[in-house]
Amino acid sequence: FLPVVAGLAAKVLPSIICAVTKKC
């Protein structure tokens, strides 16, 4: 379960950071 969540977070976090900070 945790590795799946970690993998998902690794995919989603950059796009969230990109959207929030406008740094891509």
From Swiss-Prot:
Keywords: Amphibian defense peptide, Antibiotic, Antimicrobial, Disulfide bond, Secreted. The keyword Coiled coil does not apply. Disulfide bonds join C18-C24. InterPro entries: Antimicrobial_frog_1 (IPR012520). Expressed by the skin glands. GO terms for biological process: defense response to bacterium. One of its GO terms (cellular component) is extracellular region. The keyword Kinase does not apply. It is found in: Secreted. Antibacterial activity against Gram-positive bacterium S.aureus and Gram-negative bacterium E.coli. Belongs to the frog skin active peptide (FSAP) family. Brevinin subfamily. This is Brevinin-1SY. It comes from Lithobates sylvaticus. The lineage of its organism: Eukaryota, Metazoa, Chordata, Craniata, Vertebrata.
